[in-house]
């Protein structure tokens, strides 16, 4: 993460990257101890968001997962998003002319939760930006799903939009609604 816009360089100016949206797909669940390779590239900068892509391939070269993530740069003091207009020109050499491996995160419709879990944010939930880590959100959602659904070997897609930060000491309510084969959370 060099080129002047990695986390270390940004933190020196009280800026950081935060995940705004993500879409992750897995064709299958990799077995324990599976060797895999992650490839990543940036293919787009907009005024507010940067798009970073990922693919996961097994040792035989078969792709079994992919992701499109969209990141905002924030001012750590005000916690507000910064204008990224300058990044595209200043760091044009970091942009790879390759398409995203899947669709960008889909719009999430209104959720009518049938079940809600309340969680007080503790130290182990937060990351270096001092807000809840993405994996903790995913764990909270997965923990609400029926075990039978989790044990299925069906392809999985996660679309997540982070609308606001949740920080240490705050209370987070995760709502869950099942619509057919689709699990929706808010």
Protein language model regions, located:
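Catalytic strand-loop segment that frames the active site of acyl-thioester-processing enzymes
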Residues: 1, 70-79, 84-151
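Hydrophobic, proline/glycine-rich low-complexity stretches
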Residues: 1-35, 145
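A short, polar/charged loop/turn motif at coil->beta-strand junctions and beta-hairpin connectors
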Residues: 13, 18, 111-113, 154
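A broad, structural micro-motif
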Residues: 17-19, 64, 132
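Short coil/loop residues immediately preceding or within conserved phosphate-binding loops
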Residues: 21, 51, 116, 123, ...
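HotDog/MaoC-like acyl-thioester-processing domains
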Residues: 23-109, 162, 166-169, 177-186
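Structured core of small recognition/catalytic domains
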Residues: 128-186
């Amino acid at each position: 993460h060099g080129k002047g816009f990695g986390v270390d360089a940004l933190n020196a100016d009280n800026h950081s990257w935060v995940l705004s949206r993500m879409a992750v797909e897995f064709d299958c669940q990799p077995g324990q101890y599976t060797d895999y390779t992650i490839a990543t590239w940036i293919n787009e900068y907009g005024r507010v968001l940067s798009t970073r892509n990922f693919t996961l391939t097994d040792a035989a070269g078969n792709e079994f997962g992919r992701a499109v993530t969209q990141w905002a740069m924030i001012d750590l003091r005000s916690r507000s998003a910064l204008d990224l207009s300058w990044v595209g020109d200043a760091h044009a050499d970091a942009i790879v002319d390759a398409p995203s491996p899947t669709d960008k995160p889909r719009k999430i419709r209104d959720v009518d939760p049938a079940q809600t879990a309340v969680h007080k944010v503790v130290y182990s939930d937060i990351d270096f930006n001092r807000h809840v880590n993405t994996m903790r959100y995913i764990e909270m959602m997965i923990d609400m799903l029926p075990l039978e659904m989790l044990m299925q070997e069906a392809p999985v897609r996660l679309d997540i939009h982070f609308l606001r930060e949740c920080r240490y000491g705050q209370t987070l309510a995760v709502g869950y609604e099942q619509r057919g084969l689709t699990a929706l959370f808010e």
